[in-house]
């Protein structure tokens, strides 16, 4: 899957990384968030888990935000969102125009003011870093920002940010230090 190389790279950096999979076109974001909350609760109660960080890509970033709005783990660490459609996604807008409201993800992730993603609380109290893709045709740079974000960086990438060669180092840097490594000069 798309996040497997990132998971392996984070493991090489010393993180105990676990991929949690869901079917993006089946079920609502709230349904996925409830399932993620249950998984997070189990990890939060595990005695060998010191910190519980979250990394989400695209719709998965919104699932993470929604799950953390439902319940905050006691051991919550940092959150990294890659190409998050925090204010809606161009691709969802297009899907909504082409297919109508039949696709839940398109309804929930579109840029309309009353869409799920635009009603979701910004979670300004999260220790959250955001990585945006410079050439993302699904999510605009402006839509990636979130009030209260700790740091924001743009990588020269398409929407497939988890596969970018610098993404694992940037994610690890933020999880450890609470900031990204910005290019000097």
At which residue positions do the language-model features occur?
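Serine-dependent carboxylesterase/thioesterase catalytic core
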Residues: 1, 5-23, 27-125, 138
């Amino acid at each position: 899957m798309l996040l497997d190389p990132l998971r392996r790279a984070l493991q090489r950096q010393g993180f105990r990384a676990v991929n949690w999979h869901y079917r993006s076109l089946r079920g609502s974001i709230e349904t996925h968030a409830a399932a993620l909350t249950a998984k997070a609760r189990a990890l939060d109660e595990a005695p060998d888990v010191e910190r519980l960080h979250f990394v989400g890509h695209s719709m998965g970033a919104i699932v993470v935000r929604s799950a953390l709005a439902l319940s905050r783990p006691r051991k919550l660490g940092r959150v990294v969102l890659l190409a998050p459609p925090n204010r809606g996604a161009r691709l969802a807008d297009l899907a909504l125009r082409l297919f109508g409201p039949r696709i839940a993800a398109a309804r929930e992730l579109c840029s309309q003011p009353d869409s799920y993603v635009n009603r979701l609380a910004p979670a300004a109290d999260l220790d959250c870093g955001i990585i945006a893709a410079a050439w993302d045709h699904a999510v605009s740079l402006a839509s990636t920002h979130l009030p209260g974000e700790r740091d924001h960086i743009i990588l020269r990438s398409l929407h497939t940010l988890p596969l970018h060669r610098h993404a694992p180092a940037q994610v690890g840097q933020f999880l450890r230090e609470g900031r990204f490594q910005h290019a000097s000069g």
